[in-house]
Amino acid sequence: MTNIRKSHPLTKIINSSFIDLPTPSSISSWWNFGSLLGICLAVQILTGLFLAMHYTADTATAFNSVTHICRDVNYGWILRYMHANGASMFFICLYLHVGRGLYYGSYTYTETWNVGIMLLFAVMATAFMGYVLPWGQMSFWGATVITNLLSAIPYIGTNLVEWIWGGFSVDKATLTRFFAFHFILPFIISAMVMVHLLFLHETGSNNPTGIPSNMDMIPFHPYHTIKDILGLLLMLTALLVLVMFSPDLLGDPDNYIPANPLNTPPHIKPEWYFLFAYAILRSIPNKLGGVLALVLSILILAIIPLLHTSKQRSMMFRPISQCLFWLLVADMLTLTWIGGQPVEHPYIIIGQLASILYFSIILIFMPLASLTENHLLKW
């Protein structure tokens, strides 16, 4: 008799995706982040669901409802801080996951890669709207500044912004719709994750060498499940340490001041995971140019498969490309730091140089380095 795991219509889908899935034996811990992102999404949906039971999306009561969750709801404080810091963990895993894809050439699976880029945009949109919900000073002014960027679009910009606001400023209508979208998007993201996995399982996983590993596969369970559980324990430990010991470490103190349209905070800045893009936006003096640079800083990932000029897929055996990759990482960290600094000398020029370097590495230096390495192979 065939094992029910392999014959039942429902369990055989799970079996072929998570149990008997043939997986390269050589994949390292850099391949853990996909499963960690899945766990992050589940944690965010669950904590978010319970928070939504007590939250009110109204300008008069939103701030107080969050305070009520933290003070009066049983374990409300842990729900709130797990959700807020879970978002930070989500983005750490996301950036490491994308970085892994860049380093090991996973972007040559173009369908999986493109769905991944759409997922990145969806998660960023969700996180932005979630940051608006507590209705503190940074929530209100962050929403005002970021939505206002759309007014840079020629001709329709102003109408578009007022349409998104639901009025002539960020107000009750804006908060209500942001809550609605913040609630629905994670479920859309879950569906997109299924598509992401569907495309991945069409081709199978890449591996550190970038060489096809069809002749050296092992079942996903128990080998990689055990490995993923180790990553999960490490991530949950980090998250719980953050939540229990310094829950406000990554937040902004200004968000503990209720939103006041008459009082602008001295430094408006988004959450830390958007600072690199915010620094690129600020480094261009022109509004439309800044908005385009902001969008392109993420959208540039879509053309990376076209810029792949190397004869090898992975960077494992390409030292020049490796140096450029780590330079790009250092550059992104520099941009993240600059994004949190005031707009004054020397931060302005550092931000501009880091922004130029960011695009130059991806568009010019990396393809050239790959061509150089191709020539070196002939020696």
Swiss-Prot record:
Q: How is the cofactor bound?
A: Binds 2 heme b groups non-covalently.
Q: What GO biological process terms are annotated to this protein in UniProt?
A: mitochondrial electron transport, ubiquinol to cytochrome c
Could you tell me what this protein is called?
Cytochrome b
The entry marks the following residues as binding heme b b562, namely 83, 182
Going by the UniProt record, its keywords in alphabetical order are: Electron transport, Heme, Iron, Membrane, Metal-binding, Mitochondrion, Mitochondrion inner membrane, Respiratory chain, Transmembrane, Transmembrane helix, Transport, Ubiquinone
Subcellular compartments: Mitochondrion inner membrane
Encoded by which gene? MT-CYB
Q: Would the keyword Transmembrane helix be found if you checked this record's keyword annotation?
A: yes
| Functional description taken from the UniProt entry | Component of the ubiquinol-cytochrome c reductase complex (complex III or cytochrome b-c1 complex) that is part of the mitochondrial respiratory chain. The b-c1 complex mediates electron transfer from ubiquinol to cytochrome c. Contributes to the generation of a proton gradient across the mitochondrial membrane that is then used for ATP synthesis.
State the CDD domains in the record. cytochrome_b_C, Cytochrome_b_N
Output the Gene Ontology terms for molecular function: metal ion binding; ubiquinol-cytochrome-c reductase activity
Which GO cellular component does the record give, naming just one?
Answer: mitochondrial inner membrane
Membrane topology classification: Multi-pass membrane protein
Q: Which Pfam families match?
A: Cytochrom_B_C, Cytochrome_B
